[in-house]
Amino acid sequence: MRWVRFIFLGMVLVVLPLSLYAAQTATITVTVTVRYISVAVSPNTYDFGFVDPATYTTATSDIDVTNDGNDTEDFKLQITTGPAAWTVEETSANPGAEEYKLLALFNSVAPGDIYVGDAPAEGTDDIIFESAQKNCDATNFSGDQDGDNVPSSGTINLWFRFGAPSSTTATNQQSIVVTVSAYKSTEF
């Protein structure tokens, strides 16, 4: 029996130093969120009603543009569908026959006189192009708001101004589709 105790004591003496050198552990939790880029507009229509030829008309209510994605976003604007009989005037000139101009401004309140002189005196910054998307940054479409680095759930106010053709044969209601595109905030 004594020899069993010696064997047991010998095993303890052999195993004990091993437990003193056992590895210590720590855990790492890795997290990830997949970026979700999304934009919503409300309402999704605006009716200028009747406008006179060769005049500019500013909207009386805004369109709310909301980043409903999960990260900060940049926005761009573009006319993606316009009236078949008209072309977009993308220069600082006033619209001529069968031409129109659609301008936009991000501003917390109705822009009022901010638009005065925008066409042709202030260039093309606020003109929505059909030929290409335009960044909604501090230069383009910016009043006291812009579409650069809009936080998740952030809403900015978009106001339109319509420049009517100097003359037209299209006397029925015309539709213009403006597309707001959202990009991750490093786009511009």
Question: For each of these PLM feature ranges, what is it?
Answer:
Residues M1-T25:
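Sec-dependent, cleavable N-terminal signal peptides
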Residues A23-F188:
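Signature of Gram-negative chaperone-usher
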